[in-house]
C-alpha cells in the first residue's frame, strides 16, 4: 500500500488539492473537509479561484470511494467559483480519454506536473 496524501493548500493563488495513494471512504471525508474549507475561504471573499487537482497515484479501496469523491468534488457551489481546473493523473487510457473528449478551455488533464502547473498559472 502506498502512503496517501489528502492535503489541500494554496500556492500562487491556486488551490492545490491532493488525493493520492491508497484511499478509503474516511480519507475522502478527511480530504473534503480541508478542500471545502479552503474553497470557502475564497468564496466568502467573493473571489474565484483556480484548482490544481493531484490524483496521480490514486488507488481507491473500493469503487464507492471514487463515487464519493466525484459526488463531493463536483459540487455546483465549489465549481461555479472556479476559473480553471487542472487535473494531474496517471498516464494511461483514462487520461487519454479525458484529454481527447474534453471540450472546455478552462479544464486540462495531464500526467506532467510542470506542464500542468505552467498552464494553470498562465490561464486567464
Each PLM stretch: what is its role?
Residues 1-124:
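Amphipathic, Lys/Arg-enriched alpha-helical "gate/interface" segment within cytosolic domains
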